[in-house]
From Swiss-Prot:
Species: Trypanosoma brucei brucei (strain 927/4 GUTat10.1)
Feature: compositional bias, Basic and acidic residues: 394-405
Keywords: Metal-binding, Repeat, RNA-binding, Translation regulation, Zinc, Zinc-finger
Protein name (record): RNA-binding protein ZC3H20
Induction: Induced during differentiation of bloodstream form to procyclic form.
Gene coding for it: ZC3H20
The protein's assembly and partners: Interacts (via MKT1-binding motif) with MKT1.
Zn finger intervals (C3H1-type): 55-77, 178-205
Length: 405
C-alpha cells in the first residue's frame, strides 16, 4: 500500500509540525489526539474531511474493507503503537481530582490559588469556581495567557515578582471570565479525547453532575457580555482579550474561601447551602444499604477554627436497610460502603465548605437519623447524637415514640 503522496492533498488546518516533521492531527478513539507523521499516513478520504479525522481502529486490526474510500485515517501500525506509548495519561476530571496542576493552583501559598473562573450558569460558589476545579484545556490556557499579558511582565520573574509588578498591592482575587466559553459535554460523560487541546472548558465532574442548571455543549444561557471598565478594589477580572474590570461581590467571597477538599463521590458544598449525597446501593450479605441526598444548611464560616476527624457512630445491632442522613452540618461518607460490623462512619469536614460544629459555638447540633429494618419486617428509627447528654456517651440510640411498622 502506498503512503500519502503529497501533503498538498491534505487540508492545511489538520496539519502541524512536530519537532520539524510535518504531521497530521488525528483523534485516536483509544487514547487521545495524536500527531502522526504525514509520511506514515496512507491515502484515504480522511484527508478531505472538514474536521479533524479519527483513526480507523478496524484498519489497525486488519479488518477495514474500505481501503482508500475509508473516511477515517489509516496509519502505520508500528508508528501508532509508538505514539500511544508516549501519550501521557488522559485528564480524568480536574486538578483537584488528580489531573496535572500546571500552574500550582492547589498550593494555598501560591497567588494562583486565588484565581477563580466565572461560569454564569453555575450555582456552585455563586458561579465563581476555583481554578483547581478545571482541567487545563485551550480556553483556560488562553485566559491565563491574557492574564499574564494584561500587564507588563519582565522575563525571568517568578509569580510573586510578577504579581507585585503587575498589581502593586496583591489583589484579593483574580477572576477569569469564561461566560462566553462552552462547557464540554463529552468531558462530563468521560468521552472527550481532545484532552488539554479541547476548545471547550473541562469543569470538575462533581460540579457538573450536581449542578443541573449548567449549560453543556453550548454557550451559557445567562451569559451577557460584561462592560469594559477600569479595575477597582482588590479584585481583577480578566477576559480572553486581556481587559480587566471590577467583579461582583460574589467573586471576592469565592476567592477568600480556602482551596476545597475533595468530597469523594458526594457533591461539593457551597457557602449558602446545597444538596449532597447520591443515590447509591450496596449489598453486604443480607444487608442492603442505600444512601440518599440530604439537605445541608451551612452556618457562619468565621467561627470554624479547626478541622475534625472521623466521627464513629458506634455499632448498631440491626443491619442497615436504609440510611438517611439529615444534618445541619456538611457531612460526607468516608467509605463507599459500610463496614461489616455495620459501623456508620461520617467525616465532618468544616474545611470543605466553611461549615462548623456545635462545639465551636455555632449552636447547630447535627441530627442524623438512621432507619433500620427489624426482624419482623418493620422499620425502626435510630438517632445519633455525637455529643451525648453529658458530652461523652455519644452513640446511636433508639428513637422514642418514633418506631414504625
Amino acid at each position: 500500500m502506498q503512503l500519502v503522496a503529497s501533503p498538498l492533498e491534505t487540508r492545511r488546518d489538520i496539519m502541524c509540525f512536530e519537532k520539524g516533521v510535518e504531521c497530521m492531527v488525528v483523534v485516536d478513539p483509544a487514547t487521545r489526539k495524536l500527531r502522526i507523521p504525514l509520511s506514515c499516513v496512507y491515502p484515504t478520504r480522511a484527508h478531505q474531511r472538514t474536521t479533524i479525522p479519527s483513526l480507523c481502529l478496524l484498519f489497525l486490526d486488519g479488518r477495514c474493507r474500505q481501503g482508500t474510500q475509508c473516511h477515517q485515517v489509516h496509519a502505520a501500525l508500528n508508528v501508532v503503537a509508538a505514539l500511544r506509548s508516549q501519550v501521557d495519561y488522559l485528564p480524568i476530571c480536574c486538578a483537584l481530582h488528580g489531573d496535572r496542576d500546571y500552574v500550582n493552583a492547589l498550593d494555598n501559598r501560591s497567588w494562583m490559588s486565588r484565581v477563580v473562573v466565572h461560569v454564569p450558569d453555575a450555582t456552585y460558589g455563586g458561579g465563581y469556581i476555583p481554578l483547581a476545579r478545571f482541567s487545563y484545556t485551550t480556553p483556560i490556557s488562553r485566559l491565563l495567557d491574557a492574564l499574564f499579558h494584561s500587564t507588563p511582565q519582565a522575563e525571568g520573574q517568578d509569580g510573586a515578582q510578577w504579581e507585585s509588578r503587575a498589581f502593586g498591592t496583591p489583589p484579593s482575587c483574580l477572576v477569569l471570565e469564561a461566560g462566553d466559553i462552552t462547557l464540554c459535554r463529552l468531558h462530563v460523560q468521560d468521552r472527550c479525547r481532545y484532552a488539554e487541546e479541547c476548545n471547550y472548558l473541562h469543569i470538575c465532574k462533581e460540579v457538573a453532575r450536581c449542578d443541573r442548571g449548567l449549560t453543556l455543549g453550548q454557550r451559557p444561557r445567562s451569559w451577557k457580555k460584561p462592560p469594559s471598565s477600569s479595575p477597582s478594589g482588590g479584585c481583577f477580572v480578566v477576559t480572553a482579550s486581556g481587559t480587566s474590570m471590577p467583579p461582583p461581590p460574589a467573586a471576592a467571597a469565592a476567592c477568600d474561601a480556602p482551596t476545597p477538599v475533595s468530597g469523594g463521590w458526594t457533591c461539593p458544598g457551597s457557602p449558602t447551602g446545597s444538596l449532597f449525597g447520591a443515590n447509591r446501593s450496596v449489598t453486604l450479605g443480607d444487608a442492603s444499604v442505600t444512601t440518599q441526598p440530604a439537605v445541608v444548611r451551612c452556618c457562619d464560616p468565621s467561627s470554624c477554627t479547626e478541622a475534625h476527624s472521623v466521627v464513629d457512630c458506634g455499632q448498631a445491632h440491626i443491619p442497615f436497610s436504609l440510611s438517611r442522613q439529615v444534618s445541619d452540618i456538611h457531612m460526607r461518607q468516608v467509605s463507599s460502603t459500610f463496614f461489616p460490623s455495620d459501623n456508620l462512619s461520617l467525616d465532618v469536614d468544616p474545611s470543605t465548605s466553611g461549615d462548623c460544629l456545635a462545639e465551636q459555638g455555632c449552636g447547630m447540633t447535627p441530627n442524623i437519623v438512621v432507619v433500620t429494618r427489624n426482624g419482623k419486617g418493620g422499620r425502626e428509627r435510630w438517632h445519633y447524637n455525637p455529643y451525648g447528654t453529658n458530652g461523652t456517651d455519644r452513640g446511636i440510640e433508639k428513637g422514642e415514640g418514633r418506631g414504625r411498622n
